[in-house]
Amino acid sequence: MRVLHVIARLNVGGTARYIMRLAEELPKHQIETFVATGFVQGSEAEDPSAKKLKVIRIPSLGRQINPIKDHFAFKQLLEVIREVKPDVLHTHTFKAGYIGRIRTNEINKSADKRVKFVHTFHGHLFDDPEFSGLKSLIITSFERRFAKNTDVIVTVGAQVGKDLLERKIGKPKQFTNIPPGVEPLKIPKATPRKKITIGWIARVTGVKNPLRALEIAKQFPDAQFLIAGGGDMLDQVKAQAPHNTKVLGWTDAAKLFSASDIILSTSENEGMPIALIEAQLAGKPVVATNVGGVSEVVLNKKTGFVTRKNTEDLAEALEKLINSKTLRTAQGKAAKAHAAKAFSVEKMIQAHISLYKKLAK
């Protein structure tokens, strides 16, 4: 069996590592695996895991919708299809799902077979400030249409699936939930620190709301805050950071976790936040907004705190952890156990193997 994964870009983040693990492990189970992708653009960086993959580049494939570039991206995808002749075309995130499912008949013709179409929602764009209003309505309309061309819709969290069905995207029988498998990072030995340190790691862009993290930092002048990541708001965040906040830019997650006592997430929208899973595997309690699949990762009051999307609630939860080493230790221990059990790489791989074998029948 041959499976071709398509994603617009392998930017720094959990989705790139998710695909990398599939590409590494599936061939061990007689599933030939190929990855086709475009290039990261602007202030983003490509995930280091991409260097471990033999990827097929689709030069015109980008994150933004562009009718001219998208036309060429589809033609380039057809060339890849003719070469690989996949049994399964597995697209990831909106843009690749758009290119890979808009004209399925031409893909079948290029492959000389009836290709099975799988699409994974690693989240959705409906609550993303960048895709609000009219853009959100257009995306919803597209997704409803594309779902009709899809054999299986994979979600990385139960909440993502509920959100899609509420918007009448797909039918319940099309859906399967496969939580991401995440391996613990190799955490360097922590250096002694005098202050409680709170780490924040994400793309420094609107949907992650880094400015809210700065507002919270101002409320805890005796604590140290570390902001890790890059993006279009990096310069703004650097300019507005208070005295107790270091803006690090792109930083190795393991180093950040080593330097932090608590991890903070201020996102407006999430799918299944891999960084928060990695933080918990590192034994760190997490304070995060209740968006997307966050509540499936962070168990409220057990492995951290899940709050409403406002500065006051986040700060209140954070204060509890800052003031109690006992609570930090207990929640950190619980976080590590929960993440190891719920987000097993082996479970993720086996779920994909079962999915592909079922489609092959």
Positions of predicted regions on the chain:
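N-terminal strand-loop element at the rim of the active site
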Residues: 5-69, 163, 175, 231-233
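A conserved mid-protein helix/loop that constitutes part of the nucleotide-sugar donor-binding site
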Residues: 16-24, 196, 200-219, 232-235, ...
